[in-house]
Amino acid sequence: MIEAARRELAQGGLRAMSFRRLGDAVGATSGALAYHLGAKAAILNEVVTRERLRDRRWHDEWLERLDGLERVDRQALAAILEQYLDALVQGEARLTQLIWMDLTLRAPRDAEVATLVAPWLAERRGFWSRLFEGRIEDAAIWAGLAAAYVTDEGFNGLVVGDDPDYRLLRRMAIDRLASRLERDGVGLEPLFSRLVRRMDRRLGLPTGDVAADAMGPGPRREAALAACHVLVDGGAEALTHRAVAERAGLSRSAVGYYFRTAADLFKAAISGVYLIADGRGAPPTLPPGADPTLWRGQTVVRGELAVILAAARDPTLAPYVIDQRRWRGVSYVRLLRSKGYSGLDALDGQTASMIATGQTILSGVDGDDRRDPLVSWLIARHKD
């Protein structure tokens, strides 16, 4: 029964983990399951408890595997990150990663989910601390960088981890991270930018600016922003014409006029993410006491995370994952250059953006926002 709940949660999200679906999976009635198992929250708690144990054992195997490693130098760090990311999306670990991703997306807006996930996050952070302690200088910083990087990259790997072009791009980012943004090896311009353009053509990504059609003021733009808000709050499974209409204060027919199909609505939600990231649209209502700048950044990251999670369950959406990863790197390097790091190149921006995004995801779970210190340390030697 709990295994059935685990697979429903991994493949369809929290909304899919209903008594009806679970009953169909195990041949029992919804009433019988409710009687024997109690509330849905109790089932989720049991699933997460077992998943944490499975994940803890998986990470303990990694510590045992690397027990004889005396020093973590640049080559060792790159090898560890690459092999770890490969293993993270294989076999049973893939289901664990899907569950982890779904819950980290919900945690910032669901205190009960955050309470379940925070101890799990502490264990994952602890893995990197134990791995690096006594083996590398600035071990605490490297542990933070690794935890942030594998969070973002690990989610992307669920979608395109087997793609040769993506794997080469990933290796470039790993080498750049492990070298603290030194320029040598495979990760040199113009190879990086050419490879990105190759992926654009091969994957058939949308041309031009995805958000262009929703830029002008008016109901179309409001509907796109509302779609983004629904995506951020409830994930792709919550994205319906009715939900968007209610959020935007429009009729369902009006939303359907601008975004006819479910695919159109999904693209509109992505457009909304871009609009908010560029400061041309408002995020969902600011919680009391929240920092507006941080809240905007968290909204963008949760929107991106929702897109990745949807693509992990529907491979036809994979091009959007590559597109937003590329777009984010380009935007972030512009931001860093404007702050006095004019020498950073596109790969630097891509690498730093993954640290920033991964750490923002994690801070949404436990409130430990060390994003700026981590990125500042990574790029410090490139200050003008």
Where do the language-model regions lie?
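Short, structured motif recognition centered on aromatic/hydrophobic residues
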Residues: 8, 55, 97-107, 117, ...
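Long compositionally biased, domain-poor regions of proteins
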Residues: 106, 225-233, 247, 254-258, ...
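Helix-turn-helix
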Residues: 10-46, 230-264, 268
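Hydrophobic/aromatic-rich alpha-helical bundle segments in the mid-to-C-terminal region
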Residues: 114, 118, 133-196, 212, ...
